[in-house]
Amino acid sequence: GFFECINDQEAAFMLFDRCRVWLEERGMESMEGPVNFGERNEWWGLLVDGFKPPVFQMPYTHKYYVPFFENYGFRDYFKQYIYRTRLVEESLSKVVVWKSERLLKNEDYRIISYREMTPRQAKDSFLTIYNKAWNLNVHGVGGMDKEQVEVLFKTLKPVLDPDLLYFAYYKGEPIGFFIMIPELNYIVKHVNGKISGLGILKFLYYRHIKRGRVALGLIFGVASEFQGRGVEAAMIYAFCKNIIQDKKTYDWLDMS
């Protein structure tokens, strides 16, 4: 679960000890954390570098937590990174452009945005790709069913921007997606946790009028048999061209 503690190693070790005993009593032989109860793409891990205002779904923990975990004996299991790039032509990787152009010379491949799709097409394509793209044996990652996809898109609806969702197809079959949203912490911090009355008005104002300048890469997937061919590059390039050439709202892209 999550971890909160004052700046006192003894207090931290008391919490760790209690967790360890609880797990041992239930037959567990290892302990990991801090983790969110759910998929590992949301609020997992301990922040060890880059103590700046966090982006949506990124954990924020105090710097003094790091030695608590290390001194108790925790070691890295896997590392997660957040990257930021400026959305200008100069920042576009030549490799991304080359891969995209090479792939799209084959007319069997097609990249389209959410604007060109119906919600039903997007949901069905997402479900197909997700369950082909992710290694279901990877720790913390599971498959999705139709009901979960419906819930996901219903949750995204208030913040969905059609310019931030891209899908790849091969001979009409869905093979990849790149799902982004506006960086939500920019909006949420003005609402102060109160999504009602004035809070709703503030949410709508900062979502649609005084909009943020950062797009957040939420989830990326390419069907396993099409990985390594440049499909991901083609989706990234399509998004960047759309934003840069049409001078859309966003100046930055954050990805994890």
Question: Which role fits each region the language model picked out?
Answer:
Residues 59-140:
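Acyltransferase donor/substrate-recognition loop-hinge adjacent to the catalytic core
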Residues 39-43, 77, 91-93, 176, ...:
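Short catalytic/ligand-binding loop motif for oxyanion handling, primarily in non-cytosolic enzymes
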Residues 17, 21, 25, 70-72, ...:
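Conserved beta-hairpin
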Residues 86-90, 171-172, 225:
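Short loop segments at secondary-structure junctions
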Residues 32, 84, 167-169, 179, ...:
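Short beta-strand segments
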